[in-house]
Amino acid sequence: VKEILIKNNKTTGIKTSDGVEIKSDLIVANSDAEYIYNQLISKNVSAARSERRKLKLATKSLSGFSLLLGLDNSKGKAVSIDHHNVYFPSNYDSEFDDIFTKQVPVKDPTIYICAPKDPLMTKGGNKEAWFVLVNAPRHQVDGGWDWRHGGAEYAQKIIQKLDHLGLNVSPRLDFMKYRTPADL
C-alpha cells in the first residue's frame, strides 16, 4: 500500500505501489500509527492533522529485535523445547531501564522463542526453524539508539545468551537473519 485514499475526511480506498486503486469505505491498517499518518495519509487531509500533532508529542514505546534461525541438528545436540518459550532475565526491571532510561540494547533481555515442530517449516527432517524476539529500544537517530549500526554484534550476543541458557544454538546454526527496529 502506497497511500490510503481519503475524500471529504472519509476513506475511499487504497492505492498500491504499482498505481492500482482499490475502493473501500473501511481500511484496517496494522502498522505503526506514525507511519500511517505521516506516510500513507496525504498531508492535505484535515482530519489527520490533530493525530499527527498528538503523535509528534507522544512518548514513543519500545520496539523489537528479531532473529530468524535455521538450525541443523546433525551439527550438534538438539534440545527439546516447546513451540512457545519465554526466558526471563534475573533482573527483569533492568531490561526496561536499558530500553526507556538508557535507550540502549538490553544487556540481559527477556527472550521469546517460537520453535514450531511442523516439518513444512524446515528444509529437512533434522532441521529446525526458530523465531527469536527480544525487547529493544526504538530506532531513534537523534537522542536515542541508532539501529543502523551494531545489529550483527547484538545478534551474536543473543546467540551467546541462547547458548548460555543451554540451547546449543552456535554449533547448530545453519542460517541467521536479524531484523532491528530500524528495519521495521
Put a short name on every predicted segment:
Residues V1-K2, S24-D25, R172-Y178:
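Beta-strand segments within the central parallel beta-sheet cores of soluble alpha/beta enzyme folds
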Residues D72-L184:
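C-terminal segments that line or cap access tunnels to active or ligand-binding sites in enzymes
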